[in-house]
Amino acid sequence: MSASLLTQSEITTRLRAIGFRIRTTGEMHQAVRAFKVGWFKLGPSLLIGGAATDAVGPRTSAALDLAYERHQDGKSTMSPHFSFNETKCKCGGAYSDCRRIWPTRRAVINLETLRAELYPGGLSPVSWCRCTGHNKAVGGATSSRHLKGDAVDIPHTHSLAQVRKEHLYTGLGVEPDGHVSHVDNRPGSTTNPTVWHYSGS
């Protein structure tokens, strides 16, 4: 990885390549912060005191270079098994205020752990971040954790008991077949999570 500083144009090119939408300076700053939050185990942490700033120094420049190279090589860009593209809102840019990508740190770490424990063959998120417009369009709750970037809809192939015993999540949504299809980190307890059941169609 290069230790030199990237130019603003290079930063924008790399962020766009890995999935971020950047039309303004404000969106670029948002994207840099989201990149730092999501960046996990592909290099040194980019957080300072657990927080992300919009400054791009040598370490962040090197991380952006690596993420860009991994994207070009068809590898994950955010963590060992997940890419920023997998977290982005599925509105496709239909809503002008959509930030596109804003996963929480905990969501990334927990999904890596869940994959290792229950999905060793691979786990593809069904839905992660949602902007207000898209969340409303798909019938999501007004207080949906997808709006905050800490909820992920997953393939419902594992039972409530299996997912619950991992003690990773405080919110679990269960399909009529008894398998979990939604996990989140709302305020609460991972040992006694909030559980709800979706009705059949």
Where would I find each of the regions flagged by the language model?
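Cell-envelope/ECM-targeting effectors and their regulatory/trafficking segments
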Residues: 1-116, 141
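Extended, low-complexity, intrinsically disordered C-terminal regulatory tails
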Residues: 111-139
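Generic non-transmembrane alpha-helical segments
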Residues: 18, 113-121, 162-168
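Catalytic cores and adjacent binding grooves of peptidoglycan-active enzymes
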Residues: 141-201
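Surface-exposed patches in mature extracellular/periplasmic domains of secreted proteins
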Residues: 23-24, 52, 120-129, 171-176
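A mature extracytoplasmic/lumenal domain signature
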Residues: 56, 60, 68, 127-129, ...
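Short, solvent-exposed polar/charged micro-motifs at secondary-structure junctions
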Residues: 65, 133-139, 182-186
